[in-house]
A protein has these predicted regions:
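N-terminal regions encompassing targeting/leader/pre-sequences
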Residues: 1-2, 9
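Cationic, low-complexity basic patches in intrinsically disordered or flexible, solvent-exposed regions
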Residues: 3-4, 15-17
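Short, solvent-exposed coil/turn linker segments
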Residues: 4, 102-103, 159
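Non-globular targeting/processing and membrane-anchoring segments
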Residues: 32-114, 119-130, 134-144, 148, ...
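Residue-level marker for well-ordered alpha-helical positions
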Residues: 140, 161-164
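Thiol-based oxidoreductase modules, predominantly thioredoxin-like and allied folds used
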Residues: 147-162, 175-184
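Short, conserved SAM-binding/catalytic segment
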Residues: 166-174
Length: 266
């Protein structure tokens, strides 16, 4: 497989860079197995039985990658969804602007696409959902990279001051945080149940087009619908033990509200 070092790239002229770019584009359209010759790969002291089983699994893994790409392509081709019901008003929860009003349309900044993740922290909760906290832990560290292409904001129903306090406790320093405590957004876009305290984890994507805002996509399957952006469960899938039989990732805190109204609800 052709590899390019950083030093090599720095010394390339425009013609060489064009050739390299063309080759890398071709590589991206070639199967992973074909380019890396996985059938010839062996690790120290492994058995033939292991290699045969790994080869069979590799085919399944490549099919999964191909399926993910196919689904993503279909998602990109969705027609515009419904126009935004109203230009909702939220309150910032980040340091330096806690409680200041911000309109939905302003969340886009200079981008045309907005990812808006609703996490479970209601106005009367003692602590937020441990699972949602796990997700936002990861979102905070990738926020800068994501926002080079799209706006990315996390919203909760708790008041801005409580969201800010929790963000400080978790060390969230990058991700944009807003409170929807005075807005009907979560109810309108199916991010909650019958009350403001019955919140749901939902990722929505909105798109600006011709001066208007349209809903593009939202998670609509099950509680595992955010698995693809959740490091914890995906990393556990790589281990021999697999995913632990637990409802939420391990945390050093508890949410009594969640345990009472969600996990132990009969």
């Amino acid at each position: 497989m052709w590899q390019l070092s950083l030093r090599g790239i720095l010394w390339m002229d425009k013609r060489q860079l064009s050739v390299a770019s063309s080759h890398l584009e071709n590589v991206s359209n070639t199967s992973f197995k074909e380019e890396t010759n996985m059938s010839e790969l062996q690790y120290p002291n492994e058995s033939r039985e292991y290699r045969d089983a790994r080869e069979s699994l590799l085919k399944d893994e490549q099919e999964l990658v191909d399926k993910v790409k196919s689904v993503a392509e279909k998602r990109r081709k969705l027609p515009p969804g419904g126009q935004l019901k109203e230009d909702y008003v939220f309150q910032w929860a980040n340091d330096g602007k806690v409680g200041k009003s911000v309109k939905f349309s302003e969340l886009f900044g200079d981008k045309n696409t907005l990812l808006l993740y609703s996490w479970m922290y209601g106005p009367n909760w003692d602590n937020p959902c441990p699972s949602c906290t796990s997700l936002v832990d990861g979102f905070d560290r990738t926020w800068y990279q994501v926002t080079q292409n799209a706006a990315f904001v996390a919203i909760a129903k708790a008041p801005a001051e409580r969201i800010n306090a929790w963000a400080k406790k978790r060390g969230w320093s990058q991700i944009a945080l807003v409170s929807g405590s005075e807005s009907p957004y979560q109810a309108d876009y199916k991010c909650q149940g019958d009350s403001d305290d019955m919140q749901w984890p939902v990722m929505h994507v909105f798109r600006k087009q011709d001066g208007k805002i349209f809903h593009f996509w939202g998670t609509e399957t099950s509680m595992n619908h955010v698995d693809t952006v959740w490091p914890y469960w995906n990393l556990m899938d790589f281990t021999p033990e697999g995913r632990p039989d637990i409802p939420t990732p391990p945390q050093k805190f508890r949410s009594e509200f969640l345990e009472k109204h969600y996990l132990n609800k009969e």
